[in-house]
Amino acid sequence: MLFELPGEVNNPNANVIKAVEKLKKQEPAPLSVKAKATFIQPANYDQHLEWLKDCDLVIEAIAERMDWKRDLYTKIAPYLGEHTIFASNTSGLSINQLAEAFPEALRHRFCGIHFFNPPRYMHLVELIPCQASDADMLDDLEAFLVTYLGKGVIRAKDTPNFIANRIGVFSLLATMHHGRAFDFGFDLVDALTGALIGRPKSATFRTADVVGLDTLAHVINTMRDTLPDDAWHAHFAVPESGAFVAALRS
């Protein structure tokens, strides 16, 4: 089941149907078999919230905005089943602050579950509990991720950007900083920071593109807003490169 914002009045599932069709065309392919897209049940927030009560696991993956996520949680909380696990795919927002949007009685079924893009191919998943997360629930969720999805799970603390993005985005920003200092272009930076030094061939700027420039900007802003004492705080900013900013806004 996939939820989206409702479309026009005469076709409220238009947005979610468009999203499912897009899955068939994306590269690298997010589905192992394109025909399996028919297994996805389209849903929208106006008509189908009652369906949530029958779900064992609900994963939220909307934009990296604390206010948007908390508003959504407030809206859907009354419709969650007694045993439903609700998890956020946030890239680095505070899980405890997100949990505050739920009634206290539901917080033990909430946690962070951070997949990496593209999720079909990236092995790592971070599992981040809030203070109220039930230990057995976390164990069950990890078992599902490992056994049925074939993922490698790491438990992370509720710190800014968790583990992977805290290290990885710092690495990207440091590389971009030094690239600018030497007046290196995008292609040269990626040539020097990819397979040549044992890193993924996506290197630096290609990795930023795969992550999603909008998502990357939100992750950088989280570091800027929550790590004021970090030695590199001055560099926690979206690069001012004209080409980068143009790509970000396109």
Regions picked out by a protein language model, each given a short descriptive name:
Residues M1-S250:
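N-terminal glycine-rich phosphate-binding loop for ADP-containing cofactors
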